């Protein structure tokens, strides 16, 4: 959740041919991923999240619900005992921590390599500018691995998997090898979702921090 919150391009002739084929394959991967992402204008799902350290030791397990809507709207609710709500209205992101009775508001960073949640709700038409993308298909599952093209990102790699055309799971790996696995279930796409879903009313008396 934290990763989402803050939590995915003779010998000369042969060489030229290889580069051309590689570029063509990359373009196909980008096109496939873009089509799958843009296919779902809204997504509602439950999720379970597991965070592991580089050695495979479990650091945190959480569950929750999410709703996303293009362009740039998302709502993530992590269940107790580590309850949190993260909401984007397309302009700002509000993080609500009920235990602290504190809301943190910051401007939405629309860069895909800084806000992975926007893969599911943002503008992905220029996704190839942010990531090098490869894909692998196994039966009804399509896996995409996204590696940021710059170093100033929250993660080193992001894997996004689709089953029968719907989002199935995501995995983020950061610079120290920590892995965050998110499995979605009960996925519903292209349902009517009112924009009011993404308006968070801060409780009276709560601390408000604006960044």
From Swiss-Prot:
It comes from Pseudomonas putida (strain W619). Monomer. SUPFAM superfamilies: Prokaryotic lipoproteins and lipoprotein localization factors. Keywords: Chaperone, Periplasm, Protein transport, Signal, Transport. The lineage of its organism: Bacteria, Pseudomonadati, Pseudomonadota, Gammaproteobacteria, Pseudomonadales. GO terms for cellular component: outer membrane-bounded periplasmic space. One of its GO terms (biological process) is lipoprotein localization to outer membrane. This is Outer-membrane lipoprotein carrier protein. It is found in: Periplasm. Residues 1-25 form the signal peptide. Belongs to the LolA family. Pfam families: LolA. InterPro entries: LolA/LolB/LppX, OM_lipoprot_carrier_LolA-like, OM_lipoprot_carrier_LolA_Pbac. NCBIfam families: lolA (TIGR00547). Participates in the translocation of lipoproteins from the inner membrane to the outer membrane. Only forms a complex with a lipoprotein if the residue after the N-terminal Cys is not an aspartate (The Asp acts as a targeting signal to indicate that the lipoprotein should stay in the inner membrane). The gene is lolA. It comes from the Bacteria.
């Amino acid at each position: 959740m934290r990763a989402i919150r803050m939590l995915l391009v003779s010998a000369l002739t042969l060489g030229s041919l290889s580069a051309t084929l590689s570029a063509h394959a990359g373009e196909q991967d980008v096109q496939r991923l873009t089509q799958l992402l843009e296919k779902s204008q809204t997504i509602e799902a439950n999720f379970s999240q597991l965070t592991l350290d580089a050695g495979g030791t479990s650091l945190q397990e959480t569950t929750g619900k999410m709703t996303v809507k293009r362009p740039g709207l998302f709502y993530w609710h992590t269940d107790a005992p580590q309850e949190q709500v993260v909401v984007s209205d397309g302009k700002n992101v509000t993080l609500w921590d009920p235990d602290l009775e504190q809301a943190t508001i910051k401007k939405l960073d629309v860069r895909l390599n800084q806000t992975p949640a926007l893969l599911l709700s943002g503008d992905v038409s220029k996704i190839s500018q942010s990531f090098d993308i490869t894909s692998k298909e196994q039966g009804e599952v399509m896996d995409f691995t996204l590696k940021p093209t710059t170093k100033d990102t929250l993660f080193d790699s992001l894997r996004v998997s689709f089953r029968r055309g719907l989002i199935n799971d995501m995995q983020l790996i950061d610079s120290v090898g920590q892995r965050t696995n998110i499995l979605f279930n009960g996925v519903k796409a292209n349902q009517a979702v009112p924009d009011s879903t993404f308006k968070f009313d801060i409780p009276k008396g709560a601390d408000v921090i604006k960044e």
